[in-house]
């Protein structure tokens, strides 16, 4: 597969136009997700409305464009310059040459079927998630964008270890959030703008693009994950007495989910169980909103969707309680750090949510 790099943005914040010169069918099939590849293989006919060039990932094209600038570098290497910003406003530049794709030793690579996630295995996880939520709040991303970024980061770190440097985890955060924004948002911000003010390390766009490609390869190009937000509205309608109260429940459930993704164990649960537990938690927080129902339990919630079980919902519900209690304690100690967790909706719906807050008892 060959690419031709046409041009770059003046700031270097986005990759230039990449033209596909020669694409072989086998190469395209390898780049597609499993569901897309299945469509191509069905009766030997290509998927409707798709072409080889349109099936290529934007991140892959961007990374390929960046590769043209450094032909002598390793295919999966991350090389460049990192800028560290100190609290005093001074900037320190460091050159680095680190190959993320080649672990130092076999013991650094976890097996494909890794054990359940725990905070012990992920130092700095909470700080990384907080940064993603802060960027989501600044740019007005959808809640699903932040969740996908955290999910990509979790899947990557489940099979690949990073060096013990702050810039490595920060680079992974930026790359995962950039990929998630390209998947969920109608318009993803430039890579330089994605690194908001206050970010400790600032990376060149081409460095982020290389890391995006490494993440894509590690995730086997499967980015279309199911998120809990796909179930929230449906589950909220199951218990809401009206469209308005259902919307209020859905908003609160989304906020609960975003607050809970700091807990690694929460990601062990399937998306539907997360959504059911979050809606159940929102109902129990404001029972006045459910005047037409005497109570909603894990047992009744298990009937909302095929695959839900009372045990899974109860387990997820307990994690939500622990996560929200921990978040409340941290907010009391550091109110500014966790401010990003309080906003759930995008900027277009914030004014509407303010009108709905405090009126759970009205239908």
Curated annotation (Swiss-Prot):
One of its GO terms (cellular component) is nucleus. Residues 66-75 have a biased composition (Acidic residues). Residues 50-65 have a biased composition (Low complexity). GO terms for molecular function: cyclin-dependent protein serine/threonine kinase regulator activity. The keyword Transferase does not apply. Keywords: Cell cycle, Cell division, Cyclin. Residues 39-77 are annotated as: Disordered. One of its GO terms (biological process) is cell division. It comes from the Eukaryota. Signal peptide: none annotated. SUPFAM superfamilies: Cyclin-like (SSF47954). Belongs to the cyclin family. Cyclin D subfamily. This is Cyclin-D1-1. It comes from Oryza sativa subsp. japonica.
